[in-house]
Amino acid sequence: MAQKKGGGSTRNGRDSQPKMLGVKKFGGEVINAGSIIVRQRGTKFHPGVNVGIGKDHTLFALVDGAVSFSVKGALNKHTVNVTPA
């Protein structure tokens, strides 16, 4: 007979796929229209001039140009802008 009991099942053993969030293009970088600048959950970064926002809060460039980040107001609102090249 076996000297050990059979191993029971476990409730662990699963994990979600990585979502690849974060800043994709940094301040001063030159980008093309449609390029993703920030992938995020919620609006940690808000769209500014020449920046659009997707339904999953992804920020993307509306024109070709250079990326710039700014912090404004008493609430330290982070805004992303694209200056046309």
From Swiss-Prot:
Organism: Polaromonas sp. (strain JS666 / ATCC BAA-500)
GO biological process, one term: translation
Sequence ranges of Gly residues compositional bias: 1-10
GO cellular component: cytosolic large ribosomal subunit
Pfam family for this entry, one: Ribosomal_L27
PANTHER family noted in UniProt: LARGE RIBOSOMAL SUBUNIT PROTEIN BL27M, RIBOSOMAL PROTEIN L27
GO terms, molecular function: structural constituent of ribosome
Protein family membership: Belongs to the bacterial ribosomal protein bL27 family.
Keywords: Ribonucleoprotein, Ribosomal protein
Chain segments carrying region Disordered: 1-21
Keyword Nucleotide-binding: no
Cited HAMAP family: Ribosomal_bL27 (MF_00539)
InterPro entries linked: Ribosomal_bL27, Ribosomal_bL27_CS
The name this protein goes by in its record: Large ribosomal subunit protein bL27
